[in-house]
């Protein structure tokens, strides 16, 4: 059989709008709807907001533009991602974003800047999880993935969550399955 190496899923904006309208017609504003459909034009975000979406998740992964660039395909813009976050907030969405913790070349200062970034964009929800390389990838083969390494990643993740909670005491911080996997 044929195998597709990669596809880009582009949401059908009219379909999403119709689903949102149906939810709103059945439950009014009593049911909060969260979307996570990537970067869109402002008009699309507005259309979905008008149709009944309340929250939007769009992870930054790293507030360091150089690290961000290494995580995303060529031609993908850090500035565009940040612009989308500010647009979502301005349109009245509860904003969710987040980062990976323990990325290669990521420093503690980068993580501190990530927390400051959450405050700057006025994030309402934050998802943070440890970066866990797979042993069959080039990076996974370059890092000895030992129990000690996994323990360090777990502790770094817990510390990041704790410091974020101290700095941003009223934000929702999601628990991640990746963090749970390290604790097992």
What are these regions (language model features)?
Residues 1-3, 54-55, 79-138, 154-174:
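Conserved C-terminal portion of the radical SAM core fold
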Residues 1-14, 19-84, 94-101, 124-128:
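Core AdoMet radical
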Residues 40-50, 103-119, 180-184:
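Catalytic cores of alpha/beta
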Residues 70-75, 142-150:
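Short glycine-enriched, charge-decorated loop/helix-capping segments at active-site entrances
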Residues 138-141, 183-184:
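Histidine/acidic-residue-rich catalytic or RNA/ligand-binding cores of hydrolases
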Residues 150-157, 179:
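Short amphipathic alpha-helix initiation/capping segments at coil-to-helix junctions
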Residues 174-180:
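Short catalytic/ligand-gating loop segments at beta-alpha or beta-beta junctions
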């Amino acid at each position: 059989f044929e195998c597709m190496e990669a596809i880009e899923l582009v949401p059908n904006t009219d379909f999403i709008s119709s689903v949102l309208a149906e939810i709103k017609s059945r439950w009014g504003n009593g049911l909060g709807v969260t979307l996570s459909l990537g970067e869109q034009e402002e008009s699309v975000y507005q259309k979905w907001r008008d149709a009944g979406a309340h929250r939007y998740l769009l992870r930054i992964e790293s507030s360091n533009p150089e690290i961000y660039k290494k995580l995303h395909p060529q031609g993908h813009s850090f500035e565009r991602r940040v612009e989308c976050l500010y647009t979502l907030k301005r349109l009245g969405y509860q904003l969710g974003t987040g980062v990976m913790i323990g990325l290669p070349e990521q420093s503690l200062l980068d993580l501190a800047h990530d927390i400051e970034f959450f405050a700057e964009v006025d994030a309402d929800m934050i998802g943070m999880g440890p970066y866990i390389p797979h042993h069959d990838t080039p990076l996974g083969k370059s890092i000895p993935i030992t129990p000690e390494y996994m323990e360090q990643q777990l502790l770094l993740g817990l510390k990041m969550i704790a410091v974020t909670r101290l700095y941003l005491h009223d934000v929702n911080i999601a628990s991640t399955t990746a963090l749970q996997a390290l604790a097992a």
